[in-house]
Amino acid sequence: MEERKIIHIDMDAFFAAVEQRDNPELRSKPVAVGFDGPRGVVSTASYEARKWGVHSAQSIAQAKQRCPDLIIVPCRHSYYAEISHQIHQIFQEYTDFIEPISIDEAFLDVTHNKKGIELAVDIAKEIKVRIKEATGLTASAGISYCKFLAKVASDYRKPDGICTIHPDKALDFIAQLPVEDFWGVGKKTLQKMHFMGIYNGADLRKVSEEHLVEVFGKAGHIFYHFARGIDERPVITYRERKSVGCEQTFLEDIYAKSAVIIELYHTVLELLERIAKSGFEGRTLTLKVKFSDFTQITRSISQEKILTKKDDILPLAKRLLQLVNYSSSRPIRLLGLSVSNATSEEARKEDKENSTLKPEYRELELEFEEWKE
């Protein structure tokens, strides 16, 4: 069987880099992109800011404590999306097998590329140069035979780096790889692994698949295979939008039922506006709630009828809210709503593609969508 050639391209501090490119006064200075308010959150931090411990999803208040000279720049999502589109047009010159993971990163399967270039590393080098010429921005690239290792490789020499993990070197590389760098290992999973004495790939490889499944559920299968350099997930070209959603962080935490219902109503109205603009049709409504301690939960409900009207969405949103325990000791910081489970023909084709994956790998893809938030 022919060895695959997978590239993972990840833009370096994308939002912050765009702002530094456009404003020379911001260059070489600690910059964070986000809303500069009492409830603001860092979307992206420049590398100068990261040296001070500033990172994405951190509150602006905490970021300023760590870096008093931090410069906050408002987020321009539509502008960043335009630049992202430019970058994806470059990808399309080399392959049609492109899987966007977010606005600033994507997988490319270049096993059979359009330009007939033999080495994936040469393609990655060309793409990096093309991105720099077209946008003035840098990207990091990881190359390997599977998505797991390609993504790990792209992080290995950031910023503006390139790293290849060859099949014959993969097991040695994984053996020394800290488990926190494994795809799917979050804080809670990391704590469990450390409690079990698992600190790197070599440690993980010593644990039986049965025991990993016993502790981590279906993810245990994934960790078992990753530790052995096995990742069969294909690069899937997403033709159809997966969901439409919106969320709001409140200026003050809320817990009174009346206040929460009012904010939920406003969130429903915003969601309806986005659905109308996008033309998206879905059957699953998901409620996202983030509490004052930054923990968050999601609750979902599906039905046969498409969700495009207030009379359909609002009652479902209220039902989902009833499943959430909030109080004065556990107030709500953020509410979000999204509609997914697309009804279009393209989405059904995509579902068929996904159905070829093993169940545990399909679950990983779904979980990764949540990790991005």
Describe each model-derived feature in a short phrase:
Residues 8, 181, 189-334, 339-372:
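DNA-contacting surface of Y-family translesion DNA polymerases
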Residues 1-215, 220-221, 345-347, 352-373:
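Gly/Gly-Pro- and Ser/Thr-rich, intrinsically disordered tail segments characteristic of DNA damage-repair
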